[in-house]
Amino acid sequence: MSKGTPSRGKRQTQTHLTCRRCGRMSYHKRHKICSSCGFGRSTRMRSYGWITKRPKVATH
């Protein structure tokens, strides 16, 4: 497969669809898992501590 402009024409298929649980375009069509909320993998909502910003704390 070549690089550059010719390979850009192969990008026509949809990878992600709208998730039924969170409504974002993050549900993977082939893997059947939402990358945003974890639908299809877990009954709990996907949430990690490293996603949210922590409040600024005085260091001195």
UniProtKB/Swiss-Prot annotation:
ZnF segments: C4-type: 19-37
Q: Which GO terms describe its molecular function?
A: rRNA binding; structural constituent of ribosome; zinc ion binding
Q: Which cofactor does it need?
A: Zn(2+)
Q: Write down the PROSITE patterns for this protein, in alphabetical order.
A: RIBOSOMAL_L37E
Q: Any keyword RNA-binding?
A: yes
**What does the entry list as the binding residues for Zn(2+)?**
19, 22, 34, 37
How many cofactor units bind, and how? Binds 1 zinc ion per subunit.
Could you give one GO CC term from the UniProt record? cytosolic large ribosomal subunit
Q: Which GO terms describe its biological process?
A: translation
Asked whether the UniProt record includes ATP-binding among its keywords, one would answer no
Q: Which UniProt keywords apply?
A: Metal-binding, Ribonucleoprotein, Ribosomal protein, RNA-binding, rRNA-binding, Zinc, Zinc-finger
Tell me its family. Belongs to the eukaryotic ribosomal protein eL37 family.
Q: What does this protein do?
A: Binds to the 23S rRNA.
Q: What is this protein called?
A: Large ribosomal subunit protein eL37
